[in-house]
A protein has these predicted regions:
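Transition segments tied to proteolytic processing and entry into folded domains
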Residues: 8-167
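Bacterial N-terminal signal peptides
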Residues: 1-5
Length: 167
C-alpha cells in the first residue's frame, strides 16, 4: 500500500506590470510622484527577510535610508540632476519580500511627501525597473510625451491589486 500526501506549493503570482503601466497609475494618482533614473545605494542588510521563526516581523514595511544619484523626469526628458537621500519602504507579502541591489541603476517612481521622498520596494517589483539598458526610461518618455504607452498587463485584471492599493 502506498500512501501519498499532497502539500500545497506556495507561490507568489504577480501581475506583470511594466514602466508604462506604472506611469499611467501614478499619473492618475492624487499623490505627487517623481520619476527618477539613477543609481540607488543603501545597506542591503537592512532589507527585510522573512523568517518562519518570526513570521509577523515582516508584516509592517521596513524603512531604509538610501542615496540616489541620477536624473529626474522633467517636462520633456530626464534632464534634472538629482542627488540626495530617499527612503526605501520595503514590503513583504507573506514570505516574499521586495529587494533591490545596492549600487544598481534603476528607473523608479517615488512619492514626494512634505518632508521626504519615499520609494516603495515590493515583492513583485512594482515601482522599480532596471535602467541598465535604458528601455524603461524610453518607455516612460514615450508615455510622458503623449506617445503610445505600452502595457504589460494581462487583458483581465479580475482580483488584481495595483501597487497603490490601500492596506
Amino acid at each position: 500500500m502506498t500512501i501519498t500526501t499532497a502539500t500545497q506549493a506556495l507561490a507568489l503570482s504577480c501581475v506583470p506590470m511594466g514602466p508604462g503601466d506604472v506611469y499611467r497609475i501614478v499619473s492618475d494618482s492624487e499623490d505627487p510622484f517623481l520619476v527618477i533614473e539613477g543609481r540607488v545605494s543603501f545597506d542591503e542588510t537592512l532589507l527585510p527577510q522573512y523568517s518562519d521563526a518570526n513570521p509577523r516581523a515582516t508584516e509592517k514595511p521596513t524603512e531604509i535610508p538610501a542615496q540616489v544619484t541620477g536624473l529626474l523626469l522633467g517636462e520633456r526628458m530626464f534632464d534634472q540632476p538629482v542627488e540626495g537621500e530617499i527612503t526605501l519602504e520595503a514590503h513583504c507579502l507573506g514570505p516574499w519580500c521586495g529587494s533591490l541591489v545596492s549600487g544598481a541603476r534603476y528607473l523608479f517612481f517615488a512619492r514626494q511627501t512634505e518632508d521626504r521622498v519615499v520609494a516603495v520596494v515590493e515583492p513583485c517589483g512594482g515601482f522599480f525597473f532596471s535602467a541598465e539598458d535604458g528601455s524603461a526610461g524610453d518607455t516612460v518618455l514615450q508615455c510622458h510625451l503623449g506617445g503610445i504607452c505600452p502595457s504589460q498587463l494581462p487583458a483581465s485584471l479580475e482580483g488584481a491589486v495595483t501597487p497603490l492599493a490601500e492596506d
